[in-house]
Amino acid sequence: MARFEEQKLYIGGRYVEASSGATFETINPANGEVLAKVQRASREDVERAVQSAVEGQKVWAAMTAMQRSRILRRAVDILRERNDELAALETLDTGKPLAETRSVDIVTGADVLEYYAGLVPAIEGEQIPLRETSFVYTRREPLGVVAGIGAWNYPVQIALWKSAPALAAGNAMIFKPSEVTPLTALKLAEIYTEAGVPDGVFNVLTGSGREVGQWLTEHPLIEKISFTGGTSTGKKVMASASSSSLKEVTMELGGKSPLIIFPDADLDRAADIAVMANFFSSGQVCTNGTRVFIHRSQQARFEAKVLERVQRIRLGDPQDENTNFGPLVSFPHMESVLGYIESGKAQKARLLCGGERVTDGAFGKGAYVAPTVFTDCRDDMTIVREEIFGPVMSILVYDDEDEAIRRANDTEYGLAAGVVTQDLARAHRAIHRLEAGICWINTWGESPAEMPVGGYKQSGVGRENGLTTLAHYTRIKSVQVELGDYASVF
């Protein structure tokens, strides 16, 4: 018996039945409980959502900037009023501790929406003088209908990161949440409607990426795809978006981010950063600093400090306010992470702690994996090369700065990087050489609304958040005006 009623699609400002008649289940990873049956959208449903978005976008774009701004600001207020309710639902669906979802997921998503709500009236063109009798002006116009495809690790936050700039710029969005964690995106659709967003401007279609995601990516009336997920899937989405109708794309993809701890670093601070960069949200964060480079002279002291902090991790029931480490998001993902851990053991990385599924008592019903630290890792190990997306830290030893930078950059990814040092010149010198789109000095993990987020290399295309993102949800129209005579050559 599912905890919640069957979840429908959200099209045109209301819940509607999927025409497919098919459903899938969403599971609480803490105990295997079926939370709800969720309806699976068909190609016909995608078409309904697109047509609804086309009509809704016309109404939305015709509003004044101040009208749109006020409506989005009202949605921010509702999000904050319902923070605890949404956090509780997010915890059930993702397995994240309630202490985390209450303080991070909805809070940071609402911050992004508030940021873009304030920027709506600032979307403007420019005037370019040509000569006394002629000038050019530009208009920033919405793209039209755009699609967002979300990942399972930050469901409502990602939905807000994608919809906030899209709606602020006057677009309509069709959002497809991950099949694994679909519930809070539907609640966000309710909130937008309650705030006054016109029907059709934010639709939610649930289903698989192979079907619903592909149909959205191919649709000729969709002007842009914003995707968060794995690199291999991102490449397919990008290829389909280009071949179908030359859609614009934003891709926030995988990472294998380096954290370099220099010999002069405060090791207590470095250990705090390393543990947060690997075990917050049970290691399911795309920017995690999973390759931890420590100078040979500091290895033993650093490892001891890391182990001391791992002992403070409170693995438990996500509903318990004292828990700060929950299960992985699903049982299939747990098996994937355990497979990587076995690979690390087989390739002779030295296991400092963890390395197994947690099955004591009630934990045996959930997708729990112990915080795991490997050391004496080599650059060619699978756990060092590939994104694991779980609570697995790899410690690597280096001898000098040039070596650390070279090895840190020796990856197909370039999402994030960080350094810990008390030498300001060294910090900036190293950061300027690191090939990553998001970098931190003496900290890790914060991604405020004002900060553009995105990767180098195979970690993505484009950016989310910040001023630059708003521009990518508009297109520029250039208009020349001639006030004088027109000179024809004929």
Swiss-Prot record:
Residues flagged as site, Seems to be a necessary countercharge to the potassium cations: E248
Domain of life assignment: Bacteria
Active site: K162, E252, C286, E464
GO process annotations (BP): glycine betaine biosynthetic process from choline
Pfam families according to UniProt: Aldedh
E.C. no: 1.2.1.8
Ligand binding (K(+) 1): T26, I27, D93, V180
Binding residues for NADPH: 150-153, 176-179, 209, 230-233, 286, 387
Role, per record: Involved in the biosynthesis of the osmoprotectant glycine betaine. Catalyzes the irreversible oxidation of betaine aldehyde to the corresponding acid. In P.aeruginosa this reaction is a compulsory step in the assimilation of carbon and nitrogen when bacteria are growing in choline or choline precursors. Can use NADP(+) with similar efficiency to NAD(+), a property that can be used by the bacterium to produce the NADPH needed to combat the oxidative stress imposed by the host defenses.
Family the entry assigns: Belongs to the aldehyde dehydrogenase family.
NCBIfam families: BADH (TIGR01804), PRK13252.1 (NF009725)
Protein name per UniProt: NAD/NADP-dependent betaine aldehyde dehydrogenase
Organism whose genome encodes this protein: Pseudomonas aeruginosa (strain ATCC 15692 / DSM 22644 / CIP 104116 / JCM 14847 / LMG 12228 / 1C / PRS 101 / PAO1)
Lineage: Bacteria, Pseudomonadati, Pseudomonadota, Gammaproteobacteria, Pseudomonadales
Gene: betB
